[in-house]
From Swiss-Prot:
Positions in the Extracellular compartment: 85-215
Site entry: Cleavage: A87, K88
SUPFAM superfamilies: Lysozyme-like (SSF53955)
InterPro entries with a match to the protein in the record: Glyco_hydro_22, Glyco_hydro_22_CS, Glyco_hydro_22_lys, Lysozyme-like_dom_sf
Name the record gives this protein: Sperm acrosome membrane-associated protein 3
Native source species: Homo sapiens (Human)
CDD domains referenced in this protein's UniProt entry, alphabetically: LYZ_C (cd16897)
PTM description: The processed form derives from the membrane form by proteolytic processing.
Role, per record: Sperm surface membrane protein that may be involved in sperm-egg plasma membrane adhesion and fusion during fertilization. It could be a potential receptor for the egg oligosaccharide residue N-acetylglucosamine, which is present in the extracellular matrix over the egg plasma membrane. The processed form has no detectable bacteriolytic activity in vitro.
Gene encoding the protein: SPACA3
GO terms under cellular component: acrosomal matrix; acrosomal membrane; acrosomal vesicle; extracellular region; secretory granule; sperm flagellum
Pfam families: Lys
Family: Belongs to the glycosyl hydrolase 22 family.
Keywords per UniProt: Cytoplasmic vesicle, Disulfide bond, Membrane, Secreted, Signal-anchor, Transmembrane, Transmembrane helix
Intrachain S-S bonds: C93-C213, C117-C201, C151-C166, C162-C180
Length: 215
């Protein structure tokens, strides 16, 4: 058996360049993969004998997919297996209602308009906004809360004051985001923690941010 296996030819992937992707790409992928399955079933199936291994080896060598097609198949598979972040882009009044229901209107002396203004100038109302700083930290969620102090990216020796993962701040229901934002505003600087609020919202007439919104 061992000598028979040693004599079996190796399976090689063609190294010829793959043409640019086109509309026919997915059909080629399905055809390529199905042809391999057909080749296997026609050439010994699941046989573990030396003859069966030899037959499958020859069939795969004849019908082996180009490297680019196999890479495309792998990417498609990973995209199905990996969890996707559900992005949520809020409308102005929609966000105002959610933050109002969470009790942010008047919290620590800040109006609901302060919070809506902050959300616009930090994330554009995008609950799944994620931004990377030069030091490797991340700004997360609709208020762009930073990972250096407030949440955990599994980086050692980070305070994680909000006691949550940074990925929790990307949740579209905003519950964890609001909890963490409340902790931040309990600090002496309050909403001044956010540079965007200091530059665009502090001391300004913010009535337009909640104008026409029903609660």
């Amino acid at each position: 058996m061992v000598s028979a296996l040693r004599g079996a030819p190796l399976i090689r992937v063609h190294s010829s360049p793959v043409s640019s992707p086109s509309v026919s790409g997915p059909r080629r992928l399905v055809s390529c993969l199905s042809s391999q399955s057909s080749a296997l079933s026609q050439s010994g199936g699941g046989s573990t004998s030396a003859a069966g291994i030899e037959a499958r080896s020859r069939a795969l060598r004849r019908r082996w997919c180009p490297a680019g097609i196999m890479l495309l198949a792998l990417v498609c598979l990973l995209s199905c297996l990996l969890p996707s972040s559900e992005a949520k882009l809020y409308g102005r009044c929609e966000l105002a209602r959610v933050l109002h229901d969470f009790g942010l209107d008047g919290y620590r002396g800040y109006s609901l308009a302060d919070w809506v203004c902050l959300a616009y100038f930090t994330s554009g109302f995008n609950a799944a906004a994620l931004d990377y700083e030069a030091d490797g930290s991340t700004n997360n969620g609709i208020f762009q809360i930073n990972s250096r102090r407030w949440c955990s990216n599994l980086t050692p020796n980070v305070p994680n004051v909000c006691r949550m993962y940074c990925s929790d701040l990307l949740n579209p229901n905003l519950k964890d985001t609001v909890i963490c934002a409340m902790k931040i505003t309990q600090e002496p600087q309050g909403l001044g923690y956010w540079e965007a609020w200091r530059h665009h919202c502090q001391g300004k007439d913010l009535t337009e941010w909640v104008d026409g919104c029903d609660f």
